[in-house]
Amino acid sequence: MRLLNRLNQYQRLWQPSAGKPQTVTVSELAERCFCSERHVRTLLRQAQEAGWLEWQAQSGRGKRGQLRFLVTPESLRNAMMEQALETGKQQDVLELAQLAPGELRTLLQPFMGGQWQNDTPTLRIPYYRPLEPLQPGFLPGRAEQHLAGQIFSGLTRFDNNTQRPIGDLAHHWETSTDGLRWDFYLRSTLHWHNGDAVKASHLHQRLLMLLQLPALDQLFISVKRIEVTHPQCLTFFLHRPDYWLAHRLASYCSHLAHPQFPLIGTGPFRLTQFTAELVRLESHDYYHLRHPLLKAVEYWITPPLFEKDLGTSCRHPVQITIGKPEELQRVSQVSSGISLGFCYLTLRKSPRLSLWQARKVISIIHQSGLLQTLEVGENLITASHALLPGWTIPHWQVPDEVKLPKTLTLVYHLPIELHTMAERLQATLAAEGCELTIIFHNAKNWDDTTLQAHADLMMGDRLIGEAPEYTLEQWLRCDPLWPHVFDAPAYAHLQSTLDAVQIMPDEENRFNALKAVFSQLMTDATLTPLFNYHYRISAPPGVNGVRLTPRGWFEFTEAWLPAPSQ
């Protein structure tokens, strides 16, 4: 903030003459700078010593001196920003860049993307919103979920290629023949980000803390107890077999922070700064797996860069756009794909909404062209034809005599594309004689709300990261949505069905059984996917190793920058 104040004071001196020499009194300068005459003399002396201006004072009170400017405020701002970056004061850079959006883009562009700063490879990512605090357990946003995966590790992790769980903090695990005991053998060289050695007791304590969270308690409902059975072994004892257990432990929600310090983990990057304007990660020198090739990653929270009239959509998960303005055409898409995650509609059958009426709503959505004509941005979404590849949406020939109810209520939460979807659905159902009342829950999930209790229809977003089949099982088991979709007996039956699926040791059998559960939900017109997202990552030449992850981000440990040319 001190740099910004000095720059503002310099601009106040400069502005009356637009940089031309001035003949002025100290009193006038003090009034202009909103300070005392003594203080303005100090400002003039410091600015002259820094080479910004020349001040020739005249002796005697009220005498006019000569003020000549040597640098423009713009060049001074750029020099200050360069100096702040070289000294690791990124916060000062963002404060100095408080300009109108168009100027902000021009000013920040040279600092974005891949940079070698003091011989340190650093990647700076402009981001369109502040990141929410990292809390234990489930997190609502993709950015936060991805960030948690960079800072924290779990006993297991998902393999990037197979999407199956493999060792992480535990190098191996063994399961008893009855599936009721799981031994996880810990690596012997684990360290927390603060340099402390990781002990089995640390992990045990953090696991017990996670199980105090209602959603995690539901996720690990089959766990009877967890014990440290050896200084290098954690053992899970189960009520019933759960062959998703290694998957559950690999999920970001089960990653383990230090029991005393919730933002200290063991992941490839440690968190060194977390503010509303800047998030900085630095590589963990004692990481137990392959070390990152980048030394630092920074999120610069700059919403004005993403104003629609500047041609940059904030809906893209990551958009790395760097270089000078004349180099922007060199930025190209380096990775893209269709999300496995989807926006969905659930329908609660009741005396107000019958099975065939619910099927008619779904048929209207998928067969009327509604999804294909949503005005949500070019190439942003694609209409869903399946829940997952091969889990296709059923189609029905709805009898003509089936009429929709006179009124229905829809509750939905973010993302913003569902605003458009809700309005289009309202207009489409009105043409069928059904008045749709719309209620918006301004959040990314169904936590902390009971609005669903009054809804016939509910829309939301189901993020899918790694292991999509397991992620959908976790969704049915833990999301607070489902107790509002089903009555109590039906919800209890769903949970007992999931219990029956999890005891199957064979993965293919488990997948097929889970597919049958979701196929029945779609056949019963309880659930239908609406659309998937196009994920894109754009980067300039020189930012290498950028690979799209299932969450629409890229793996920070794989990205790298070539050494700068001499």
Swiss-Prot record:
SUPFAM superfamilies: Periplasmic binding protein-like II. One of its GO terms (biological process) is peptide transport. The gene is ybaE. One of its GO terms (molecular function) is peptide transmembrane transporter activity. Pfam families: SBP_bac_5, SgrR_N. It comes from Escherichia coli (strain K12). InterPro entries: SBP_5, SBP_5_dom, SgrR_HTH_N. This is Uncharacterized protein YbaE.
